[in-house]
Amino acid sequence: MMPIPANPTNASIQPQSLYDVWADLAWRAMLTEVNLSPKPGLVDRLNCGAHKDMALADFHRSAEAIRHWLPRFMEYGASCTRLPPESVLAGLRPLGMACEAAMFRATAGVNTHKGSIFSLGLLCAAIGRLYQLRQPIAAETLCATAADFCRGLTTRELRQNNLQLTAGQRLYQQLGLTGARGEAEAGYPLVIRHALPHYRALLAQGRDPELALLDTLLLLMSLNGDTNVASRGGADGLRWLQQQAAVLLQQGGIRTPDDLVYLHRFDQQCIERNLSPGGSADLLIVTWFLAQISQVNH
């Protein structure tokens, strides 16, 4: 796991340098998630999970490519403070598409971090806006600002009846899943109300940081209506994965290295069922990133 930077900046540093510090934390969040092992159905240091088209090195290259775009999201967020927040998203889309193109170039066409570009792009734009407005930059204010950016997004994009439905529209109409859009529009409640307090509490208890993150991933998997899982396994696959994660948590979760045997077994089951909780992995990245925000003095 990447080390958490200690006291990365101070109040006298210039905005552009601050943006680089926040971008570095977001980059570390992506690396921390993919290096975390073992993760059920996901790419990690041990295997490629339920994926045949991507490997650990793809995620490392992708994170590096995305890293250089993150300050631009902050700059845009800072530049449009006179706009109502719900008007910001339209200007973020071209940045997001350009960042995606950089990701695809780095991975030779493999979609490693599209969900993280969406979530981290929103949060980085929120950082820029709040910094420019001299408002507090904290997990709660960032998620609330991201929610303001996404106001009406689910209705606009998922309730459309196109002749050719996107995967997200199909899952919304069939199963009522809103995916990354719904979580963002709601202000990341799975992170703010569940994952982040859980992770912080485990660290406060002295839990090993990697074990705490793995336990937090299980919590997210048990609660999240993960469209990545549903697109592969349908409602039954999603229900099975949520139940398996919940059972592990009820049995005590991941407290010691001895408990990793349960994750190895869960991983093999996910691989056999071709299930990958990529949406929960994206939310774990958000959780770790927000947990580090307080380290940056601004």
UniProtKB/Swiss-Prot annotation:
- Top enzyme class of this protein? transferase
Q: What's the Enzyme Commission number for this chain?
A: 2.4.2.52
Report the domain of life of the source organism: Bacteria
Which GO terms fall under molecular function for this chain's record?
ATP binding; triphosphoribosyl-dephospho-CoA synthase activity
Biological processes annotated in GO: prosthetic group biosynthetic process
Q: Which reaction does it catalyse?
A: 3'-dephospho-CoA + ATP = 2'-(5''-triphospho-alpha-D-ribosyl)-3'-dephospho-CoA + adenine
Q: Which family does it belong to?
A: Belongs to the CitG/MdcB family.
Q: Tell me the protein's name.
A: Probable 2-(5''-triphosphoribosyl)-3'-dephosphocoenzyme-A synthase 2
Q: Which organism is it from?
A: Salmonella typhimurium (strain LT2 / SGSC1412 / ATCC 700720)
